[in-house]
Amino acid sequence: MAELTALESLIEMGFPKGRAEKALALTGNQGIEAAMDWLMEHEDDPDVDEPLATPLGHVLGREPTPSEQGGPKGPGSAVGEGKPVLTEEERQEQTKRMLELVAQKQREREEREEREALERERQRRRQGQELTAARQRLQEDEMRRAAEERRREKAEELEARQRVREKIERDKAERAKKYGGNVGSQPSPPATEPGPVPSSPSREPPTKREYDQCRIQVRLPDGTSLTQTFRAREQLAAVRLYVELHRGEELGGAQDPVQLLSGFPRRAFSEADMERPLQELGLVPSAVLIVAKKCPG
C-alpha cells in the first residue's frame, strides 16, 4: 500500500496547502508530526499564511528526491515513473490515522494550556494572599501604635491629676501650718470676757483652678470660624496644624503657612511660642484666635 506524502496528508486533514508547505519547509521536512506541531503552535500568528521565500527550484512541502539528496537511485526511482495510487479505503484509513494524530496533539496542547492557566491562577492567589497579609500587618501596626498612644496620653493625664492633687494637699498643709489646726477653724472668743468681737483672720485667696482642657475658637479671614478642644498641655503648634488641615482654599492652600494672633490683648504669636503649652500662653480654659497669612521672612 502506497503512503501519502506528508504534504498530501496535511492537505487531506484540512490544512491549507500554503500553510502545510510552510510548516514542512520550516521544520526541515522532518515528517508530518513535526509539521503538525509547528502548525498548532503558530496557528494564531498573523503571518502564518504568508508565503515563505524559498531558493530557486525548490518547492515548498515537496519531499526531496534521492537525486536532490545526492543518494543512489533505486530501481523504482526512474524518471517519469508513475506514483502508486491509493485506493479509497487506503486513503480513508490513512486520513483516519492522521486525524487521530491531530486530535492527540490538540488534547496535549489543551492539557498544557490548562496546566499553565492553573499555575497562573495559583500565582495570582499567592500574590493576593501576600498582599492581604501585608495589609493586615500594616493595620495591626497602626492599631498597636494607636493603642500605645492612648495609653501614653492616659498615663500623662493621670500624672497631671496626681500633681494637681499633691499641690492641693501641699497648699492645705501650708495653710494649716500658718493658721494652726485645721484649715477653716477659727478660735472662738472667751465667753466670760465681754468685749469687742475679734476680727476674723484674712482669708487666703481661692486656689486657682487647674484646667486639663481648653476650648479654642479660630476665626478665619473669610469670616468663618473653627472650634476645637485641646489639652491644656498641648503646644500652640497643635492649634496651627489643626487650622492648616481644616481651613478652606481662601488662604492659598495647605502649602502657605499661617500666623496666629490674639484679639485682646493684641498679640502675634512667634515661632518660639509654637513650642509653648496653651496653659502657659494664657489660652486656658478658652480663647479666641485670629488667622492671618504668615509674612515671608
Curated annotation (Swiss-Prot):
Record field: compositional bias (Pro residues): 187-199
Chain intervals with Basic and acidic residues compositional bias: 86-122, 137-177
SMART domains in UniProt: UBA, UBX
SUPFAM superfamilies in alphabetical order: UBA-like, Ubiquitin-like
Locations listed in the record: Cytoplasm
One Gene Ontology molecular-function label: ubiquitin protein ligase binding
Coiled-coil portions: 86-176
Residue ranges of the region described as Interaction with BRCA1: 43-297
Keywords: Acetylation, Coiled coil, Cytoplasm, Phosphoprotein
Residues with PTM Phosphoserine: S199, S200, S270
Cellular-component GO terms for this entry: cytoplasm; cytosol; nucleoplasm; nucleus; VCP-NPL4-UFD1 AAA ATPase complex
UBA domain residues: 2-42
Record-linked Gene3D superfamilies: DNA helicase RuvA subunit, C-terminal domain, Phosphatidylinositol 3-kinase Catalytic Subunit, Chain A, domain 1
Region entry Disordered, spans: 40-210
Modified residues (N-acetylalanine): A2
Domain of life: Eukaryota
UBX domain mapped to chain residues: 209-291
Pfam families from the UniProt entry: UBA_7, UBX
Keyword Nucleotide-binding: no
Subunit composition and interactions: Component of a complex required to couple retrotranslocation, ubiquitination and deglycosylation composed of NGLY1, SAKS1, AMFR, VCP and RAD23B. Interacts with HOMER2. Interacts directly with VCP. Interacts with BRCA1 and BARD1; interaction takes place when BRCA1 is not autoubiquitinated bur is strongly enhanced in the presence of autoubiquitinated BRCA1.
Name of this protein: UBX domain-containing protein 1
Organism: Bos taurus (Bovine)
